[in-house]
């Protein structure tokens, strides 16, 4: 399966059969190279990936400044140290799951809930971890 198929079929999927889906998603290498993304995923800046990777290494690094992605600022909320970063902005937000080689991004807007976004992103991230990726 191609990386684009993982994005299209596992991240931009119909959530719970309700016709809802994430607003944007991507799979990005730890070096910031985009492996695959939805058409709506923002253009990443190198310093944004650097900050995200530093937060995985030093949990709490992004809390004072917020998480920036494509120039959008998210308030960092409780995640899982070294494994998951979660952010909130208005009625939407972001979940980032770290695997051995990649970062799995999911961005949501209402009516999709934070829990639904977490489930979709973390399910694929856990699968990739099981595959050694």
Curated annotation (Swiss-Prot):
It holds the Pfam family Profilin. One of its GO terms (cellular component) is cell cortex. Keywords: Actin-binding, Allergen, Cytoplasm, Cytoskeleton, Disulfide bond, Phosphoprotein. It is found in: Cytoplasm, Cytoskeleton. InterPro entries: PFN, PFN_euk, PFN_sf, Profilin_CS. Occurs in many kinds of cells as a complex with monomeric actin in a 1:1 ratio. This is Profilin-1.
């Amino acid at each position: 399966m191609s990386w684009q198929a993982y994005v299209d079929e596992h991240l931009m999927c119909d959530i719970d059969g309700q016709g809802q889906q994430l607003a944007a998603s991507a799979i990005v290498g730890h070096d910031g190279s985009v492996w695959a993304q939805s058409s709506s995923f923002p253009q990443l800046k190198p310093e944004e990936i650097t900050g995200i990777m530093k937060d995985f290494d030093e949990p709490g690094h992004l809390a004072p400044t917020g998480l920036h992605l494509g120039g959008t600022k998210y308030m960092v909320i409780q995640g899982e140290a070294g494994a998951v970063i979660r952010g909130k902005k208005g009625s939407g937000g972001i979940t980032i799951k770290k695997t051995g080689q990649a970062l799995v991004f999911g961005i949501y807007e209402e009516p999709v809930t934070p829990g639904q976004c977490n489930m979709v992103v973390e399910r694929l991230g856990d699968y990739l971890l099981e595959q050694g990726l």
